[in-house]
Amino acid sequence: MAAAATRPYDVLLVEDDIADAMLIQDALSERGTRNLTQVSDGIEALEYLRDPDNARPDLIVLDLNMPRMNGREFLAVVKEDAELRTIPVVVLTTSAAPDDVTGAYHHHANAYVTKPVNLEEFEAAVRSIDVFYLDIAVKPPREQGH
């Protein structure tokens, strides 16, 4: 793996498959992840993101095919939320269907990587996000009362 990001960062991993979650956790820890929180569906992810006691993640890694609220539905909600839509999202899924790829980018995704996970491709996606979102961009403060 290449050099870690210039600063540690927080990741929300939205993945229901334990083996995939462990693989991504290992890859991200090598990239400088400070805190990684894993949830198993979009509902849990939104609950985490909307809880004012939780740190706002610097990056969301999202599977599309999950129970309850899937990744497509989650992306649609995130895109409409002024606070959440600024968080970069890497979609990591088994689907290479053109509608899924186009839909993901239309609904906020910053990168799209297919499973089985090619760690080099995944790392390149995260690294491209590092350059702008983690090293250059300033995160907006969490609004009071949210």
Where are these regions (language model features)?
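Short, glycine/charged-rich "phosphate-handling" switch motifs in NTP-dependent
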Residues: 110
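Acidic, metal-coordinating helix/loop segments flanking the phosphotransfer/catalytic sites
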Residues: 23-25, 38-59
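Receiver (REC) domain active-site loop signature in two-component systems and cognate sites
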Residues: 66-69
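His-Asp phosphorelay/catalytic-motif detector in bacterial-type signaling
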Residues: 7-8, 55-59, 83-88
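Conserved acidic segment of CheY-like receiver
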Residues: 8-28, 45, 60
